[in-house]
Amino acid sequence: MNSAPLSTPAPVTLPVRSIPGSYGLPLVGPIADRLDYFWFQKPENFFTKRMEKHKSTVFRTNVPPCFPFFGSVNPNVVAVLDVKSFSHLFDMEIVEKANVLVGDFMPSVVYTGDMRVCAYLDTSEPKHAQIKNFSQDILKRGSKTWVPTLLKELDTMFTTFEADLSKSNTASLLPALQKFLFNFFSLTILGADPSVSPEIANSGYIFLDSWLAIQLAPTVSIGVLQPLEEILVHSFAYPFFLVKGNYEKLVQFVKNEAKEVLSRAQTEFQLTEQEAIHNLLFILGFNAFGGFSIFLPTLLGNLGDEKNADMQEKLRKEVRDKVGVNPENLSFESVKEMELVQSFVYETLRLSPPVPSQYARARKDFKLSSHDSVYEIKKGELLCGYQPLVMKDPKVFDEPEKFVLERFTKEKGKELLNYLFWSNGPQTGRPTESNKQCAAKDMVTLTASLIVAYIFQKYDSVSFSSGSLTSVKKAS
């Protein structure tokens, strides 16, 4: 999909420049870059230092994983770190997305039923359109019960938080939050109730956590003391048998309890039962549960930061002016009228995108433009964009390092949505079978807005610190 105006041909006035940087010596270069990425510099500093060194937002480097036990993985990438160059990742005429969800490394298909699920398919593959249309149909049908289900599950979660606060000074966020997410998305995406199985109800979210962690371990930092993390986590791919039993329990849960959705997948979208089951689990586990498990703690952390007391007051006022304190007034339509609440959600996604790195492979030779230069990209080269840096492009965003509540309000704010790319495309874009933009792009931002509105209907103020809820003041 073209993300105009950024994907328009480069102006002829821009100079053509060879791509700076190098991949270093064989074996040595990739390992040195891997150690910088995970250990000595960390990802954002890794890209920042190279951007400063080369005086360019486009350069060659290596990204993990790599040698010694990833011999089939090519770590060579062309980094694209400004808004203009990054936007080429969404132009499906010049790039393709087969098997590059997390770079040249792809977790074994045994994690997904011995098949490539939709996230690993290119738009040119017929199966992509079938599964993308199926996922959009799921969301459309789920939207009918989305809001009441969300409010019910939020009531349960915040009752747990309040009970924990009554016993101690803090309520740990992640366990209750992930249980909430698992229940909510099982009900709305699968049409399946986890409570029918005590094991799934109590441990389903843990099964998903371990399934995700084992697959993605070579590509993410988990905070283990170095060099143990490099030796034990980033040096090899973990075998599926470690999570096989629990994954098969999730497969059985979907097969038994999501029969209506599975039937529709087969009759209306010509998918096999196995294709539907494993794609549903990937949508549930990676896209919905995994994405929100990263996004919501950040959203709540921004909301509950003591430094943002003034921001809470503004958000609370907007929520109560629009919908009062009655949860029955909350709807997709009502939160669309909350300009500040939506801007708060967008600004969180700008500074902390749930999926920080995005990749695409050149479908053909083409000319890639940054703000100040044009570069020749060869067919087959892998492009890598690190969003936390891209979204701080000073040529697009004023005060890019600062959290600005009102950034996405009024006409200028609406224009900036063209350059908000957290969803694998611009916020103003439309997910279709011909692009790779997140099918739930709008549902994510509306759901987050509903959660913020719910909180300020229920509470005058909230405080979060170090992954815990530390205080609440109920609505007066």
UniProtKB/Swiss-Prot annotation:
Superkingdom of origin organism: Eukaryota
Amino acids binding heme: C438
Induction: Up-regulated by wounding.
The entry's keywords: Chloroplast, Fatty acid biosynthesis, Fatty acid metabolism, Heme, Iron, Lipid biosynthesis, Lipid metabolism, Lyase, Membrane, Metal-binding, Oxylipin biosynthesis, Plant defense, Plastid, Plastid outer membrane, Transmembrane, Transmembrane helix
Protein topology in the membrane: Single-pass membrane protein
Pfam families named in the record: p450
Location in the cell: Plastid, Chloroplast outer membrane
pH dependence of function: Optimum pH is 6.0.
Entry annotated with the keyword Lipid biosynthesis: yes
Primary localisation category: plastid
InterPro entries listed in its UniProt record: Cyt_P450 (IPR001128), Cyt_P450_E_grp-IV (IPR002403), Cyt_P450_sf (IPR036396)
Function: Cytochrome P450 of the CYP74B subfamily involved in the biosynthesis of traumatin and C6 aldehydes. Metabolizes 13- but not 9-hydroperoxides of linoleic and linolenic acids. Can use 15S-hydroperoxy-11(Z),13(E),17(Z)-eicosatrienoic acid (15-HPET) and 13S-hydroperoxy-9(Z),11(E),15(Z)-octadecatrienoic acid (13-HPOT) as substrates, but only 5% activity with 13S-hydroperoxy-9(Z),11(E)-octadecadienoic acid (13-HPOD). Produces n-hexanal and 12-oxo-9(Z)-dodecanoic acid from 13-HPOD.
Protein name in UniProt: Fatty acid hydroperoxide lyase, chloroplastic
Organism: Solanum lycopersicum
Organism lineage: Eukaryota, Viridiplantae, Streptophyta, Embryophyta, Tracheophyta
Primary gene name: HPL
